[in-house]
UniProtKB/Swiss-Prot annotation:
Bacitracin is thought to be involved in the inhibition of peptidoglycan synthesis by sequestering undecaprenyl diphosphate, thereby reducing the pool of lipid carrier available. HAMAP family: Undec_diphosphatase. Belongs to the UppP family. Its main location: membrane. InterPro entries: UppP. This is Undecaprenyl-diphosphatase. It is a multi-pass membrane protein. The keyword Acyltransferase does not apply. Its EC number is 3.6.1.27. One of its GO terms (biological process) is cell wall organization. Keywords: Antibiotic resistance, Cell inner membrane, Cell membrane, Cell shape, Cell wall biogenesis/degradation, Hydrolase, Membrane, Peptidoglycan synthesis, Transmembrane, Transmembrane helix. It comes from Salmonella paratyphi C (strain RKS4594).
C-alpha cells in the first residue's frame, strides 16, 4: 500500500469515526463496512481504529472542558446553569454511577465481548438499537423529570449506566443505548445526549487504553503518519458532528436515526452476506 493511498484511507476512516462515534448510529457498523470496502482489515486496522477513537474522545474533552472540570470542583467564569435552572448538581458521583455497570461487565466478559465482533452480530444490534430508539421516543414521559443535566438524580445516572451495558454488544452504539435509557428514565433528549458525551470520556478512554495496550505490538514507526492523519481527522470531524448533533436534536426526534440504523443493517447484509 503506497503512502498516499494509506493516508487517504486514514482520512476516510477518520471522517467515518468522527461522524458516527457519538451519534446513535453505531460507529462499529460503519467502520466494518467502510474498512471492508477499502480492503483495510486485520490487526493493523483494529489498532488504527483504537487510536483514532482517541481523537473522537479528545473532541468531547474540548467541547465540554468546563463541565468536566466542574465535575471535580474546578469552575471557570460564570456558573454553568442558566436562569431558572436548578443549581449545579451534576457531580462526579453521577458519572461513576453511570460507569459502574458497564465497567464491571466489560472487565468480566472482555474476551467474550471481543468474540462477538463480527458482521452478523453487528447487523442484529443495529436493528435492536434502532428499535430501542423508537421505543424511547414513544415511551418517554411527556414532560421530562430532568430537563437539564443538573436535574438528574443518582438513580437516573445508574439506570443510564445499566442501559450502557447494551453497548457491550458490538454494534449497538454506546450513545444510542445511553441516550435511549436516559429518555426512558425521564431525562430530556438534550440532557441525555450531554450526559452520554460526558460519560463517554472515562468509558471510552479506559476501553481504548486497554485495547491499545493489548494491540501495541501491531503498531510500527511506519504506521505513525497514517495513524496521525486518522487521529486528527477524527478529532476535527467529531467536533463538528457533536456541535451539529446537539443543535439538531432540539428540532427533531431520534426516529430518523433509527431508520438510518435499519438502512445500515441492510448494507451490512448486502456487503457481507
Amino acid at each position: 500500500m503506497s503512502d498516499m493511498h494509506s493516508l487517504l484511507i486514514a482520512a476516510i476512516l477518520g471522517v467515518v469515526e468522527g461522524l458516527t462515534e457519538f451519534l446513535p448510529v453505531s460507529s462499529t457498523g460503519h467502520m466494518i463496512i467502510v474498512g471492508h470496502l477499502l480492503g483495510f482489515e486485520g490487526d493493523t486496522a483494529k489498532t488504527f481504529e483504537v487510536v483514532i477513537q482517541l481523537g473522537s474522545i479528545l473532541a468531547v474533552v474540548v467541547m465540554f472542558w468546563r463541565r468536566l472540570f466542574g465535575l471535580i470542583g474546578i469552575h471557570f467564569g460564570r456558573p454553568l446553569q442558566r436562569e431558572g435552572e436548578s443549581k449545579g448538581r451534576l457531580t462526579l458521583i453521577h458519572i461513576l454511577l453511570g460507569m459502574i455497570p458497564a465497567v464491571v461487565l466489560g472487565l468480566v466478559f472482555h474476551d467474550t465481548i471481543k468474540s462477538l465482533f463480527n458482521p452478523i452480530n453487528v447487523m442484529y444490534t443495529l436493528v435492536v438499537g434502532g428499535l430501542l430508539l423508537i421505543a424511547a421516543e414513544c415511551l418517554k414521559p411527556k414532560e421530562p423529570r430532568a430537563p437539564g443535566l443538573d436535574d438528574m438524580t443518582y438513580r437516573q445516572a445508574f439506570m443510564i449506566g445499566c442501559f450502557q451495558c447494551l453497548a457491550l454488544w458490538p454494534g449497538f452504539s454506546r450513545s444510542g443505548a445511553t441516550i435511549s435509557g436516559g429518555m426512558l428514565m425521564g431525562v430530556s433528549r438534550y440532557a441525555a445526549s450531554e450526559f452520554s458525551f460526558l460519560l463517554a470520556v472515562p468509558m471510552m478512554m479506559g476501553a481504548t487504553v486497554l485495547d491499545l495496550y493489548k494491540s501495541w505490538s501491531f503498531l510500527t514507526a511506519a504506521d505513525i503518519p497514517m495513524f496521525a492523519v486518522g487521529f486528527v481527522t477524527a478529532f476535527v470531524v467529531a467536533l463538528i458532528a457533536i456541535k451539529t448533533f446537539l443543535q439538531l436534536i432540539k428540532r427533531i426526534s431520534f426516529i430518523p436515526f433509527a431508520i438510518y440504523r435499519f438502512v445500515v443493517a441492510a448494507a451490512v447484509y448486502v456487503v457481507f452476506f
